[in-house]
């Protein structure tokens, strides 16, 4: 089994001192930095977008892990790929068909980026099994997407276990 990766999110960072916050994560041993991108449509909240990723891309050596919680991720995949994302994770629930998801994953790979697929807490994990061979990351949401500082949903643990068994 691969070692666990901790990817601290900048969602609750002090944006007036974002460079220092990211450096602190880096100095603390983080290898990834997680960007929760929210559009106010797919989820209720709006977070940040391309300017934030572009502005900090050159100040650290961490892997830029971009989680697109947006209604039309395909439209923005090229923009985030060019802005410095190393991993782009899209949501299963944003798409009308499996074919659209496979095309989005291929688009991410066309930019030489790692592709991830996220599922909301109520989405059956079996829904994404067919995509696993094409993915480098799977994100099983253990909170409702769109808000920080929520209580962990214990119901997500059996999904994670089932996913691990499917991958192994």
Each language-model region and where it sits:
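Conserved N-terminal beta1-alpha1 strand-loop-helix module at the mouth
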Residues: 1-89, 95-103, 107-110, 114-115, ...
